[in-house]
Amino acid sequence: MASAMAGAGPAPGLPVAGGPVVPGPGVGIPGKSGEERLKEMEAEMALFEQEVLGAPVTGIPTAVPAVPTVEAMQVPPAPVIRPIIATNTYQQVQQTLEARAAAAATVVPPMVGGPPFVGPVGFGPADRGHLDSPEAREAMFLRRAAVAPQRAPILRPAFVPHVLQRADSALSSAAGGPRPMALRPPHQALVGPPLPGPPGPPMMLPPMARAPGPPLGSMAALRPPLEEPAAPRELGLGLGLGLKDKEEAVVAAAAGLEEASAAVAVGAGGAPAGPAVIGPSLPLALAMPLPEPEPLPLPLEVVRGLLPPLRIPELLSLRPRPRPPRPEPPPGLMALEVPEPLGEDKKKGKPEKLKRCIRTAAGSSWEDPSLLEWDADDFRIFCGDLGNEVNDDILARAFSRFPSFLKAKVIRDKRTGKTKGYGFVSFKDPSDYVRAMREMNGKYVGSRPIKLRKSMWKDRNLDVVRKKQKEKKKLGLR
């Protein structure tokens, strides 16, 4: 812009640095007073500042009109008084812009504080005024917003028995050397009675549950109030089987020193190794040692190494369970007890033998399993001279009018399946048996008249045949 202005020359009516105002054509310089010239210069400066700062410029007149025209072109006064443009105005504007850019680039991030401040669990009525003040509320809000709620984890062993800590303290005091990191006790500020969980912020507690305590800003609130906690259980209570072996393994893995194993032997004896005790506890005289659990009987295969070692639930399952005692009856009822019959139990325990029906006739014997299908106490009729068309259904339909009718069967050849011309009919009632013999003898069943006889199936049994032979021998018939 300056080069363009320098090449074109000063515009009429604009001030030149270090020189007078160039008047426009037709304007007489001697006719203007000093106040009018000052107003024209201020108007031109305002237009020039707008052009430099990038504001829209309506346009610069080529000639400066008379006094009324100058009053019409005046810009309304700005609320902030602007300095007069000098030769170093451009440099000042550049420095201001650079300072703003540097300030925007170097924005201070939110400050991250240290560990969160844990206030006292309870506070008195005198401290409520401090918490209700706006400064305390703002500080508490900023602390909750900026500080993470979780505390950094402390690197320490997961579990160190009390006996090992006592033995280690006695060993380090006697030897004068530092403790191993794995057996060092935690910081004293972290040692205290076991709590169910981390306490919440003091503002979340009800007003009646807050106990009087030190002021909010005091550092004494970091430690919990001193109370008399319950005595911790001595080492060896509830730790299960193989307690001494576990102590030796923990000491050997943590310290790796021979003195630590000696300290375990001292601590396992039951006497305290030194005055240093982590946490409050009762004296050893008040602690009642529990009896050691009885060793469980192990199977012979596990002892010989044939099977892998069993776990604790499996060992507990091997312990013989005591049987519940049987209720004893009163002494007066002892004589009324009846012993259970042993014969019935023996009969029930043995499987029933399958009956075998052995028949004998014409000097030969054979087994007939078809006789097992019939009732042994029935009254059976032999039916002869049956036609080839007669089957079990036809024979049963002919004798089914009798109330005690049981079964009817036609005997067939096993190889060909053809009928042999005879069959059997059984009844439960002997009266029906007699009626059937009288009424059905000679009647047509199928295409032929039926012939009925008394069945002799019992006479063909081997037992009956032998019995008859013995009777005949006694009578001297044969």
From Swiss-Prot:
Residue ranges of the region described as Necessary for interaction with HNRNPK: 234-478
Gene Ontology biological process terms, A to Z: negative regulation of mRNA splicing, via spliceosome
Chief location: nucleus
Start and end residues of each stretch annotated as Disordered: 1-33, 171-207, 317-354
Phosphoserine carried by residues: 133
Matching Pfam families: RRM_1
Cystines in this chain: none
Gene3D superfamilies recorded: 3.30.70.330
Modified residues (Asymmetric dimethylarginine): 151, 156, 166, 179
Name of the molecule in the record: RNA-binding protein 42
